[in-house]
Amino acid sequence: MIQTDAFECKYIIKGSIEYQIEKEIFTLHEGDTLFFDGRARHRLKNIGATEALILAFYLF
C-alpha cells in the first residue's frame, strides 16, 4: 500500500480497476471517477482482461 501528501482524483479512461483505500474496496469501470485523501493507505489492481488507462490528478 502507498501514501501520498496530496488529494488524488482518478478518472478511468479505459478498463476496470479495483481500488483499495485502507480497508474499503471500490470497483471502477470506464467513465468512473474516484476522489480521496492520498494520506490514506491505498493500492490499485487491474481486474479487467485488457490494459487499463487512468488519468490521475494530484492536488497539493
Features from the language model and the residues they span:
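Ligand-binding loop in jelly-roll beta-barrel domains
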Residues: 29, 38-60
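Short, conserved beta-strand element in jelly-roll/cupin
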Residues: 2-19
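Short histidine-centered beta-strand/loop micro-motifs
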Residues: 1-4, 45-47
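Short beta-strand segments in beta-sandwich/barrel cores
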Residues: 15-20, 33, 42
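Short acidic-glycine-tyrosine-enriched beta hairpin
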Residues: 22-37
